[in-house]
Each structure stands twice: as structure tokens, then as C-alpha cells.
Amino acid sequence: MNYLGVLVGFITTFFIVTKYLTTEEVGLTRVLVDASILLSGLAQLGTNTSAMRYYPYFKDEKERDHGFFGWSVLIPLVGFVIFTILFFLFRQPIENYFSKNSALFVDYIYFVIPMAFFMMYLMVFETNSNLLLRIVIPKFIREVGIRLMTLLVYLLYAFKVIGLDGMVVALCLTYGIATVLNIIYLFSLKKVSFRIQPAYVSKWLRKDFVLYTFFLIATSLASNLIPFLNTFFVSGKLGLAVAGINTIAVYIASIVEIPYRSLAAISRPHISQGMKDNNIGDVNKLVKNVSLHQFMASIFIFFLIWINIDLLYSLIPNGNVYDEAKLVVLIIAVVKIVNTSLNVGATVLSYSKYYYYSLLFTIILTITAIVMNITLIPMWGMEGAAMASLISYVVYYALLLMFVNVRIKVNPFSLKEFYTLLIVISLFLIDDFLQRYLSQYILEMFDNKIIGQIIDSVLRTSFLLMIGIFSIYKFNISKQVNDIINKFVSFLTRHKKI
């Protein structure tokens, strides 16, 4: 399901958006969506996290969970009202910041409010379904449904059925429809009551919830801002057109982290249980294993992207415009590798008795990112914004992992990451040799340049991938990977005999 959504998003972004939208319009849609995600994330007041924590205290099928789901709807509404008021109070400074280089965003800035509202309740009702162990349908709506509707919106705009105003309205309605579908599904379960029971909430529970919520709000102020700093700094300082070019580059780099979600989702419950049982030795082994496989997956995907980056941009409509951000792809991909490989350390900290330190490290990350963006964007443009992200995350993880290593005695690093890095560097050197001395002969064989590039890419990629897999296997980097290869070879051998 996740990969189906990625495929739809890939087609939409690379072949529809880049062909039919100007770079400024691409930047506009990115800033609108990111601003809406930020507002919705803050307005939730940490409900999605606190719902997971406190639902067991309310869970009672006979009493329809004592109105828990009513609280889960009311609290975000309060948060939305508060942050919408703040939005209007700071509207003028926000508009002044964007007006010089991103005036088009200022024209559509008020659409952030309805889009954020729909996004907020989309997540609220998905969380409610997850609490009832109903995960598939809400995830399908978010991962596939929204992307399909977004594709339809862009096609309507491409064929001039709707204008720019209509496209922005339709994008808002996309999230609205998804939210309504989640509500319908939740009610179809016939287990939900939104009638609040204030008398059921004990004094202790109320106090604990308030304190925990304040912690989540403080954390979310920083953590929700981080993913969107680049978008806001690039659009505000360099304009929506540059932000649009940067958006495509970031999307390409984000392919690196596709395996991260699945691996992280599988590992978190085990880390949580290990920390609860104080099995630090087992947690340390698990963390090293998770970090290694995240690193292997992300760096090999990055390798495949980077050796084919010129072909990728040549296939994208208007690729000669978007390839200005080629260096951004490189830097952001490295950021993604760092984040996917080392985020398991942050997971350990969040499940430990020192969880409150995560707020401190997140604040450090935010401040570093802001300072670096302000410093580097005037010097290097969108590449400066990418470097700001890289420096910020390196500082963040260096401090966080030192703390986790000293206080919790957990360390995600091993020599196997170093060996993997050496293998990938060797593959890059081999690819450089192939491109210098062999690719030109392949390209000369074809009159059509694109066909020649594709054939060359397929041959080089296949050859290098086989060398990479063989090297990982031969040096016994991962027992799990070796087991998969052995089973595959055994299957082929048996099949051949038959």
C-alpha cells in the first residue's frame, strides 16, 4: 500500500507537476501544504501521541470508552482556535516576510486555515481508527486516496478545466474529502461515542494529561517546525520559483528514506519493550542491527539515484530547469541517510526515563537550523538551505547519541557501517571508470540519445548492483541479507533441477 502511494506520487510529481505547472506554481503548492501541515501539527496539541498513551485508561467497550473519542476531537479543536488566533495576530509579519519574493503565496495564504483544519482531523480520526486496531482503510485513504485525488486535481488544471484558484480550492477539498471518508469509516465500526464524560476523568489523570500535553506542545513547537524550515526560508528569501525547483530535488532525495517507515515501525515496539524491561544489552543489539540495515538500504538507494541523476532529470519534463538543484539532491540525500540511520537513537531516548531530554535536543536542532539557514542561504542559495539541514542534523545526532551512549549505554554504530560505506565508495569509483571509458561507446550505438542513456543506465546499474550485493554477501555485512540471498540461490537451484 505504501509503495502504491509512492508510485502514484512519483508519477504525479515527475510527469504531471513538472510538465503542467510553472516552477512558481510548484513552489506555491509546496508552501501551502507545508504551512498547513505545520499549523495542523501544532493545533493537535499532541493529541495523536497522548491518545496512544491515555486510551487504555478509558478503554471500556460496555461504556463506549467513556467518551474518550469526544476528548480526542474537542482538544484539537481548542488547539486549532488558539493557533488560528495566533495566525491572524502574526498575519502582517508573515505576509511582509513572503511579500517581496513570494507574493503569490500571500494571495492564497488564507487557504492555509481550511487545509490545516482538514489535515488535523484527518490525522485525529485516523488515530482513533488505529486505537481500535483498524489501520488498513485509514492508511489507504492517506497514502493512496489523497495522492489519487491530488493527481486528478493537477490533471484538471493541466487540461484547463479549472484555473489556479480552482486548483488551490480543490487541493483543500482533497483533504476535506479524505477526512469525511475517515469519519464515515470510524462510525461504521459502531464502537465510537463522542459524548464526553467529564466526571470519569480523575484528578490524577487530568493533572498527568495536562503536564504531558504541555511537554508535547513544547516538543511539537520545535519538531513540527524543523521539516518545513527549508521550504519557508527558500520561498521567503529566494522566491516561489526557486522553492519549486527545490521541491522536486527534495522529492528525489526523499526516495532514499522509503524503507525507513517500515523498518522503524517494526523496531519501535521491540525497543519500547526492551527499555521497559531494562534489557539494555538486547536493546543495544537491536539498535545496532536496525541502524545497520537502515544505513544499507538508504545508502544503496542513494547510490542508484546518484549514478542515474542525469538520466532522471533528462526524463523529467522541463528537466533542464529543475536540474539546477542537482547538488541539493546530493546534500538532502545525505541528510536522509543520516536521519534514517541514526533516528533509532532518538527512539531509544524517547522510551527511556530520560525522555524529557528529547525536548532539549529538538530545541538545539531547531535553533541550529534557523541560524544556519539565515547564514548560508544568502551565500549559497538553495544549496545553502540544504547544507543548513545537513549541519543541523549532524550537530543534533552527535549530541543526542553521545548522551544516549553515556547515560543509557546504547550505541547504534558498528564497523559494519564503515565496511558498507567503503563498498559504496568503491562502487562509485567503478561507475566513474565505466562512464569515462565505456558509456560513450554505448551511447554512440544509438541515434536516439535518450534510448542510449537508458540502455547505458540499465547495464551499468545492473552490473554495479550485482557487485554491491556480492560484496555485502562476501564480507558477511548482514546475516539477514545473507540468509535472504542463500534462500534465493537455493530456490533458483531447485527450480533449475526441476
For every predicted segment, state its role.
Residues 160, 164-170, 182-227, 270-285, ...:
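Interhelical loop/hinge segments that connect adjacent transmembrane helices in multipass membrane
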Residues 433-498:
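Membrane-proximal transmembrane or re-entrant/amphipathic helices at the cytosolic face
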Residues 14, 44-60, 131, 249-291, ...:
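Helix-loop junctions and terminal segments of transmembrane helices
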Residues 118-144, 333-364, 404-406:
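Membrane-interface junctions at transmembrane-helix termini in multi-pass inner-membrane proteins
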Residues 1-49, 80-88, 115, 211-236, ...:
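Signature of the first transmembrane helix
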Residues 140-155, 160-190, 250, 363-368, ...:
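Hydrophobic alpha-helical transmembrane segments
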Residues 91-112, 240, 306-336, 446-451:
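Interfacial segments at transmembrane-helix termini and the short loops linking adjacent helices
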Residues 1-5, 32, 41-92, 107-110, ...:
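Membrane-water interface segments that mark the loop-to-transmembrane alpha-helix transition
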